[in-house]
């Protein structure tokens, strides 16, 4: 079906760690988020091409991705991939402007979308019968320092029944790089 938002899993979630995409989609569905998929039209976001200096390949991939989202009738990309989020949120708008391409696409990390539903009282996590536990969150370089998404993942953790968020000593802007 057509929706104003499309879920973009990214290469890792689509081809390597598919449980990430499946869990993200299940969570978005459970929260009542209306979205569709690009399916065969989804390409790599172009991060590898950009960092390798393959500018022409990167530009082609970016143009194809923007066209695919627009052809789907969407104006919002929801992603679970930190690199895709960075590209759609920060890099694509800059390059589209530089190349004279109409962009007009909003990017949201799935944690932002679900946290909005929790805040609005439209979604809550069910009690799962697990013993109380403590959980921490690592702010990745792409999601944290580049896309500046710090609170939504924490809000979701805090919304989980019987789960306590414990902050690492180095968090948010001061989080250590994981080394990837």
What are these regions (language model features)?
Residues 1-180:
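Iron-sulfur cluster-binding electron-transfer modules in prokaryotic oxidoreductases
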């Amino acid at each position: 079906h057509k929706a104003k938002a499309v879920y973009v899993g990214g290469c890792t979630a689509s081809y390597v760690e598919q449980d990430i995409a499946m869990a993200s989609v299940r969570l978005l569905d459970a929260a009542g988020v209306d979205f569709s998929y690009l399916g065969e039209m989804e390409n790599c976001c172009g991060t590898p091409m950009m960092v390798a200096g393959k500018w022409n390949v990167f530009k082609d991939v970016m143009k194809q991705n923007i066209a695919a989202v627009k052809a789907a009738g969407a104006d919002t990309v929801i992603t679970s991939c930190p690199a895709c989020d960075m590209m759609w949120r920060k890099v694509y708008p800059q390059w589209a402007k530089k190349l004279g391409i109409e962009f007009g696409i909003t990017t949201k990390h799935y944690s932002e979308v679900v946290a909005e539903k929790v805040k609005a009282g439209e979604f809550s996590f069910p009690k799962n019968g697990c013993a109380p536990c403590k959980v921490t969150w690592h702010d990745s370089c792409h999601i944290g320092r580049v896309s500046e998404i710090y609170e939504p993942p924490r809000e979701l953790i805090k919304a989980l029944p019987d789960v306590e968020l414990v902050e690492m000593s180095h968090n948010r802007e001061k989080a250590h790089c994981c080394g990837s």
